[in-house]
Regions:
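An exposed, glycine/acidic-rich loop-and-rim segment of catalytic or binding clefts
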Residues: 1-350
């Protein structure tokens, strides 16, 4: 494994931004940035052995700050939405910035995704660290977060999150990479085939906040229990799709057991033959089909992206869990260690 580090730029407040490249013996590589502990590139072979970058992203580091799509970065302190920017913990109500309609999204405008993390290269890995102060974006507790990335010789990227706090808080971490298995900038993902290890999903209101118990996917456009083209029913007249101009929905992973790795999703491109298996220890997975990519900064392909040119498969806890006691808890207390993992494993079908 070859790991290189370069100075990529400087943040608006003067922090150095580093770019790391992890390249395995086959020439497949990953690029990671200290902006939001982000994935900038994943370059893997297709069915003919041609290596191409399959992750959406930008050429200039400055474009990663406050980009609408949150491309490739790790949002926090709470990924996804918290209703009305409020939650109560141990009898105390906390107020958070409202930045997505009436709700709080991805930790707010100054979320983890828009911060420069400390970073270091190890023998076969790169590790990022961020310290979030008590009261930052309204959240309680001084929080130390570590994002540890490993790239394997068989083209699997593993991200392990760990975190500790000195005061009870809520925490939900994921990575917001957008995938196009035909190659970044090479058309839309509507013909990609998707499968979820999920028999239920979370219906939402029109602001994409879950309304209660999970519903079965069977017999609805939300059913990806077998491989199905993403575009097959994306325009169906169905509430979950009408609210978001496509898929922006949370699915509950079958047979969830805390700390146990299992398959969350599989994505396949018949055009390139590339296949992605996503595994996680987390209880849920959010699919977002890039419904609002228009107008984002120019991509690595040299132009702006169009809607549906990438799909985000975000392994995480459920949206609005701090206000939904029926969901798996997102509360982290002093003396506990938050630990969750996501693996993106790439292969080809010939």
């Amino acid at each position: 494994m070859k790991i290189t580090k370069e100075l990529w730029g400087t943040s608006p407040d003067g922090k150095e931004i580093f770019l790391y490249t992890l390249e395995n013996e086959s020439g497949a590589f990953v690029r990671l940035s200290s902006i939001g502990a982000g994935i900038v590139s994943i370059a893997v072979p297709d069915k003919d052995g041609k290596i191409a970058d399959v992750v959406l992203g930008y050429t200039k580091p400055e474009d990663y700050f406050a980009d609408g799509p949150c491309a490739g970065k790790c949002p926090g302190r709470y990924a996804n939405r918290i209703a009305l920017g409020k939650f109560t913990l141990d009898g105390v109500e906390y107020s958070l910035p409202v930045n997505n309609g009436p709700n709080h999204l991805h930790g707010g405008p100054e979320g983890f995704q828009n911060q420069v993390w400390e970073s270091r290269a190890e023998r076969k890995a790169v590790e990022f660290q961020y310290f979030s102060q008590d009261g930052e974006a309204g959240y309680p507790g001084n929080l130390k977060v570590v994002a540890h990335y490993e790239w394997s010789e068989d083209n699997a990227l593993r991200l392990t999150f760990t975190a500790q706090t000195d005061k009870a808080t809520v925490l939900n971490l994921t990575n917001h990479a957008y995938f196009n298995l035909d190659g970044e900038g090479n058309g839309n993902i509507l013909d990609h085939e998707l499968r979820f290890n999920a028999a239920v999903y979370l219906p939402t209101d029109e602001t994409l906040i879950p309304v209660g118990e999970a519903d079965p996917v069977a017999g609805t456009p939300m059913d990806f229990q077998e491989f199905k083209k993403i575009g097959a029913e994306i325009k169906a007249d169905f509430p979950a799709l009408n609210y978001g101009k496509g898929y922006d929905n949370c699915f509950m992973i079958n047979d969830y057991e805390p700390g146990q790795l299992q398959t969350a999703a599989q994505l396949y491109s018949p055009e390139s033959g590339r296949q992605l298996e996503v595994l996680t220890t987390q209880p849920a997975v959010q699919i977002y089909t890039g419904n609002w990519l228009e107008g984002c900064p120019a991509g690595k392909c040299g132009r702006g992206y169009h809607d549906y040119e990438g799909v985000a498969i975000e392994c995480q806890h459920c949206p609005d869990s701090p206000n939904k006691p029926e969901f798996p808890t997102t509360v982290l207390r002093p003396g506990e260690t938050f630990s969750e993992a996501i693996i993106w494993a790439f292969s080809v079908r010939k």
